[in-house]
Curated annotation (Swiss-Prot):
Keyword field contains DNA repair: no
Entry's localization field: Virion
Keywords: Host-virus interaction, Late protein, Viral attachment to host cell, Virion, Virus entry into host cell
UniProt function note: Protein that forms the 55 capsid fibers. These fibers are not always present and may have been lost in some lab strains. They may enhance the attachment of the virions onto the host cell wall.
Keyword Disulfide bond tagged: no
UniProt-recorded name of the protein: Capsid fiber protein
Species this protein is from: Bacillus phage B103 (Bacteriophage B103)
GO CC, any one term: virion component
Family, similarity comment: Belongs to the phi29likevirus major capsid fiber protein family.
Length: 283
């Protein structure tokens, strides 16, 4: 227990919540402000200016006049004129009722500030309003603009975040983001043949696909590519026979026969048959 002398700052009624203050080297007591954490409770009536001895005990419960009807288990805070009231605000809760009471009656309050405390962005004191809006996920376009000014120094990055990049901004952003010259050329839409080859080497690991993209696949690579896409092997047209549909060569041109006798005519006809057989016709 510890005691000290204090003076009543105003009329104080017993069983009301108090706060301490100092004035001219004296300690003064008065009713605790509404929605604050009280420092003590009065146990006797006092007039303004009365001198009293305050004895501080490690009390675990106070008896206080209820401002309103209170039920057992209600969390409580300071009400009007040092009375106690119900609350759901964890920031000003200092205890909970262990018995019910009607308005104007004494209620026993167990002292405890060990509650889950909910802190909202508005509780953060001098924090910038734009930051509070960001924490509450309800930023306006103006908030976003102000936050970019707070968080980002580079003008090109700001332009990117605001969705208003110029060609100059884009070029500088590419320099900020990429070190590879071929990638930069690709993003700027100005690739040379060397850039294209280097980009293909960056992007593709399969040698067959690289050969295809470089337009120089050899025969084995072509076979590999056909296998990769499920095309199988090339189709070879069979030779035409009397029973098989197939391919034939184009027969070379044959001049008109100039035969004037049967023997020469037969010779020219046989030459025609030979040309047809050479072209793949079975006769």
């Amino acid at each position: 227990m510890y005691s000290f002398t204090a003076y009543a700052n105003s009329v104080i009624v017993a069983f009301h919540l108090l706060k301490f203050s100092s004035s001219e080297n004296n300690i003064e007591i008065s009713y605790a402000d509404e929605d604050t954490i009280p420092e003590y409770v009065s146990i006797r009536d006092l007039n303004a200016g009365d001198k009293t001895t305050v004895e501080l005990y490690p009390l675990v419960a106070w008896k206080v006049i209820a401002q309103e009807d209170i039920s057992t288990g209600d969390r409580v805070s300071v009400g009007k004129n040092g009375q106690v009231k119900k609350t759901t605000d964890m920031r000003t809760t200092f205890g909970y009722a262990v018995s019910p009471a009607k308005a104007g009656q004494l209620v026993t309050v167990a002292i405890s500030t060990v509650f889950d405390t909910i802190i909202t962005p508005d509780d953060l004191g001098d924090v910038d309003d734009d930051v509070k809006a960001f924490l509450k996920s309800n930023t306006t376009d103006e908030n976003k603009s102000n936050l970019r000014e707070l968080l980002v120094a580079d003008a090109d990055v700001k332009a990117l975040l605001s969705g208003s990049t110029t060609d100059a901004n884009k070029a500088k952003l590419r320099d900020l983001l990429f070190s590879n010259l071929d990638v930069k050329a690709f993003l700027s839409g100005s690739t040379s043949e060397d850039n294209k080859v280097n980009l293909r080497n960056l992007l593709v690991s399969n040698p067959a696909i690289l050969a295809f993209l470089n337009a120089n696949p050899d025969t084995d690579t072509q076979t590999t590519l056909r296998t990769m896409i499920g095309a199988g092997t090339p189709y070879t047209l069979p030779a035409a026979t009397t029973t098989t549909l197939g391919g034939v060569k184009r027969m070379p041109a044959i001049a008109n026969s100039t035969a004037t006798d049967v023997a020469t005519l037969v010779k020219d006809f046989n030459n025609l048959l030979a040309a047809l057989r050479t072209a793949g016709h079975s006769l």
